Amino acid sequence: MTVAQVFVVGILVALVLITAFAVYTAFGPPSKKLADPFEMHED
């Protein structure tokens, strides 16, 4: 592999990991700690 291919693969792996972490945070067990500001707002 050339240096450019290693660089591109590294960036793609980083993007996949960031996306997986975001989905886990949004829908996994940590989502129980997230607050909904619209539910807390009084009209």
From Swiss-Prot:
One of its GO terms (cellular component) is plasma membrane. The keyword Magnesium does not apply. InterPro entries: PSII_PsbN (IPR003398). The chain crosses the membrane at residues 7-27. It is a single-pass membrane protein. Keywords: Cell inner membrane, Cell membrane, Membrane, Transmembrane, Transmembrane helix. GO terms for biological process: photosynthesis. It is found in: Cell inner membrane. May play a role in photosystem I and II biogenesis. Belongs to the PsbN family. This is Protein PsbN. It comes from Gloeobacter violaceus (strain ATCC 29082 / PCC 7421).
